[in-house]
Amino acid sequence: MVKKEINILEELQYINENTPLEKVNDPLLSERKISLFIKREDLNHPHMSGNKWHKLKYNLQKTINKGKNTLLTFGGAYSNHIYAVAAAGKIFNFRTIGIIRGEEHLPLNPTLSFAVENGMKIYYLDRKSYRKKESSEIIKQLQEKFGDFYLLPEGGTNELAVKGCSEIISKIDIDFDYICCPCGTGGTLAGLISGLNGNKFALGFAVLKGASFLKDNVNSLLKNFTYSSFLNWDVNLDYHFGGYSRTNSILLDFVNRFSSITKILVEPIYTGKMLFGIYDLAEKGCFEEGSQIIAVHTGGLQGLKGLTSRTIR
């Protein structure tokens, strides 16, 4: 059973909420007089790394406050979110259920193997049903099967996730012009925008193809959390490389070069696409000379294990 009287932040001793900012020393940027800093959120926890901890922490606290002992959430077979929720369940003694898009494939990939090893119950939902996963019909079926649970949306994105991600801004102690992050559901970007409170500029890089919906998602999250709208942000849709989890030799070569130069490991699904976009926009002169840019490393390095178990397209 879940411990009822618990403060998430006090209990978890191994979270580093003061992750470093590391400057990128790269002639491709310096010759354009652009300064790039990486906010190393990948270093905040071994298994709930990057934006996942920020999205989870207030949702975990609410789960406890409501007296729930089961977390149910959704994700793909290689989901960083599924991985992080399973880890959280193990750490905080929650029962966790992962509703996975698609059919079962054995043996389990590294992401799902980790989830199961950490106590998560895996349940597969065919793709047609998955598209309406948060409908009252599907939720009722899941409640009948698994009993009472705290529902955490796919990707962990809701108003509490926005609250957690907004706190990233308060940990930045240098002046800057832009802050960037990769975008899957828009929760991290909404959090950054909220934390900026109308100052500076936040730029998200969509990792999905056809992600024009992200702007509406972000606006909705902002209105629900801050009751305000902001103009100091945008979502770039040009660097998805064909869609979620898609990549090619150009992106992989860039990621390998970046990691070699900086000694900062990144994956090509989220952070790698954002960084490619930043470099390309810098080359095209889209950032003013002298600009200081912060790129949020959203973790997800567990996904690198999965890349060796599937074909890169």
Could you say what each language-model-derived stretch is?
Residues 1-313:
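PLP-dependent amino-acid enzyme catalytic core
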